[in-house]
Amino acid sequence: MGESSFTVLRDIGSLPLTENEEIRFSIDVYRGFRYVSVRRYLQTDGFAGPTRDGLTLTVEIIRVLEPKIAALPDDPKSVEDGQLGKFAKRQGSCVVVAIGSFKGKRGLALRQWQDECGWTKKGIWLPLEHLKEIKALFRQTREALDEQPTDDF
């Protein structure tokens, strides 16, 4: 495998949103580093594949974020709006995770922040109505990361 190649190591699962739209969680490797990809996928007559909606999370972010998401109440109506945390991704960049509303629906927003320019276009919004599935996907991702890697990357 080349030094700069991108490889999906493991598909964790998906969160179906509509008949032709889903959010997929996967563990990937790029330039020798493992990370988690949370990305929206579409399947239409003219296009099938990943969209630009999504972001990558480091292994360390998942290990800290998953317990915070697991601790949220099971009933989405009892989850309070607010920031769950701000997690360093690399120097000058972090991921901000918050509960909020968008277009009349509540969700879990994961957005990237750059110190020099503010919010970037990288991010994903997970509908809170799927909180049970969201918790399970983050737990399964953390468990998969805790397993010993079988691939040399």
Give the label of every model feature segment.
Residues 1-153:
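Positively charged, low-complexity terminal tracts
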